[in-house]
Amino acid sequence: MQCPHCHHNGSRVVDSRPTDDGRVIRRRRECESCGFRFTTFERVEVTPLLVIKKNGTREEFNREKVLRGIIRSAEKRPVGMDVMTQIVDEVENKIRALGVSEISSQLIGEYVMNRLVDVDEIAYIRFASVYRQFKDTGVFFNELKDMLDKDKLKAKKETNGKSEAK
């Protein structure tokens, strides 16, 4: 690191400590040439993630927008804020793990719905009705039927698992 006083390119770290909730590291440095002490800050450079909307426009990923959608769908439902925040965390981590710079809003919605269906089925249906834009009651009915079929299959597996354990 170049010294701001004498512009020598050598310095040593005297002290290092995390700040800002652990996302930034503050380092005290000392120039090897003139002994001048100065502070530097180190943080992870996060590449922006762009969301491709249905109309083709792009906007930066906004986790608060995803959270608002989940909150709206879970309104008056027994879903805690911590659970909703955890869903957003999991979805964001999954997206970032893909290593892509752009992702469709449809895929984000699918990731949210995959988690929400296990948390609260009513919240899931509400969220799906917005993301999948149900055009009529037939499409809505088919979504409900698919969910009920999955529930029956899950219940059947649980019942078979219990009878095999006996």
Swiss-Prot record:
| NCBIfam families listed in its UniProt record | transcriptional regulator NrdR
Zinc finger spans (unnamed)?
3-34
> What organism is listed for this UniProt entry?
Levilactobacillus brevis (strain ATCC 367 / BCRC 12310 / CIP 105137 / JCM 1170 / LMG 11437 / NCIMB 947 / NCTC 947)
The cofactor(s) it depends on are: Zn(2+)
Alphabetized InterPro entries for the sequence: ATP-cone_dom, NrdR-like_N, RNR_NrdR-like
Q: What taxonomic ancestry is recorded?
A: Bacteria, Bacillati, Bacillota, Bacilli, Lactobacillales
Q: What's this protein's name?
A: Transcriptional repressor NrdR
Q: Which gene encodes it?
A: nrdR
Q: What job does the chain carry out? A: Negatively regulates transcription of bacterial ribonucleotide reductase nrd genes and operons by binding to NrdR-boxes.
GO BP, sorted A to Z: negative regulation of DNA-templated transcription
- Gene Ontology MF: a single term: ATP binding
How does the cofactor attach, per the note? Answer: Binds 1 zinc ion.
Similarity section: Belongs to the NrdR family.
Entries under Pfam families matching the protein: ATP-cone, Zn_ribbon_NrdR
Ranges for the ATP-cone domain? 49-139
Alphabetized, the UniProt keywords read: ATP-binding, DNA-binding, Metal-binding, Nucleotide-binding, Repressor, Transcription, Transcription regulation, Zinc, Zinc-finger
